[in-house]
Amino acid sequence: MFFNSVINKLFIIGKEIQTMSSLFSLTLCFVILLVSVTKGYFVAYSLGLSLVILLVTFTYQGFPFASLLKMGYISSQKAFSIITILLLIGVVTSIWMASGTIPALVYYGTQFINPQYFILSAFLLTCIISVLLGTSFGTVSTVGVALMIMAKEGNIDPHIIAGAIIAGAYFGDRCSPMSSSAHLIASLTKTNLYKNLAYLMTTAWFPFIASTIVYFFLSLGNPIQATSHNLLAEIPQIFDINFLVLCPALAVFFLCLMKIEVKVTLAISIAIALFLGIFVQNYSWLQMFQVIVFGFHLHSQTQLAEALTGGGIVSMLRVSLVVIISTFLVGIIVGTKTLASVEKLFRRISSKSGLFLSTIAVGLVSAAFGCTQTLAILMTYQLMKDKYEQEKMSHYQLAIDIENTAVVLAPLVPWNIAGLVPATVLMTDSGFIPYAVYLYLIPVFNWIGFKFVELRMQRKFE
């Protein structure tokens, strides 16, 4: 009897030590990620170091090393399916610059801006461009930079305009057929991308309308004093700007409406842009090959050269590496049941509004801990999927809820690269967060929607 009591106590102490060592390792990983982001280091380095720390910790706790690698590999397989799409998106970004598509979108788009409603116009324009490009970073670094330069020249508060630009940039990052995060979530939840996008649009209307009203009143109080800048004047000097160069973007738009497979859509758009780059913009085949692989760069010391740069296969290799390491890392964390205590907190939740509120909390904490949008998505999925299955929620509901929480909340965490990088590109700081209205209205309105339906159902049965 005494012997059994001692064994039980030792077992409990051992479990407590194991839990403490896991928490210490996770905290250390968080600090490493945070330092990496604030210092501007490539996040894959900190993720790789975090992976080593967790492998050592769990091996010390008694998990077979081979089993840990298997957990990570099985999880990372989900990332492999979107690597091709990521690489194609990288090519699209660079080749659209070389073909004149992105310069034309910036040039024509800014022509429609009303000085009196500049902030509202900036939000709407970045929404449109982000849907076409499918990347928040690409939108911010092209049309976003042009708008910020115009805003600063017109004496508009940079935090307000940055908030409108970043909110608009994540409109497309959330619901564009070219969005890497949308593809990742569809892959994780085993759902159809186009069905997801249709559902996302239905949950976006009220937050979008409310955001436009807010930006309308902000525009009235902050009219721009100047609407032209050298940046826009440079575009037609360097590129042949005409409606023909918009064909790659139009191809994506119409092929997506026809629900053509995304890889085929991107490949067709790339082929059209390649033709335009060679025969309209007069680049050589070798130059276009370099653009496809290494990204687009203007060899001049101008503001346009700073704004129009990037893309290419190489740029997406870095992103792909982050996605693979992140999924590997999360696979080990989930496989070792390190966060089992967190999952227990959700067991008593049964209402849709309560479940969505839990997803918001998990998405926010994951965004704060992971420091990247990718980790926020992966951790939210892994922590919430069992509860959604338990409540007999469809995979589509889980996909939409992740889009409406982790995806849009990540940019609102000051040290998460989803918001830190766009803010840095726009030469501002976390002061943009209160003005990124659309990003926090998405989860708020969706929670209100769930709550409203529940209250109506309660009244029916009273």
Specify the residue positions occupied by each region the protein language model found:
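Hydrophobic mid-bilayer segments of alpha-helices in multi-pass membrane transport proteins
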Residues: 21-33, 40-61, 83-89, 244-253, ...
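Interfacial loop-to-helix junctions that mark the boundaries of transmembrane helices
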Residues: 36-46, 74-77, 109-114, 231-242, ...
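Membrane-embedded alpha-helical segments and adjacent helix-loop junctions characteristic
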Residues: 64-150, 301-385
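Short juxtamembrane and helix-loop transition motifs at transmembrane-helix boundaries
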Residues: 97-107, 125-126, 223-235, 397-401
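Hydrophobic transmembrane alpha-helices that form the pore/transport pathway of multi-pass ion
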Residues: 114-202, 362-404
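Transmembrane-helix bundle segments that line or gate the permeation/cavity pathway
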Residues: 165, 170-173, 177, 208-223
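Transmembrane alpha-helical segments and their short flanking loops
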Residues: 184-194, 222-251, 272, 276-294, ...
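C-terminal transmembrane helix pair
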Residues: 188-208, 350-462
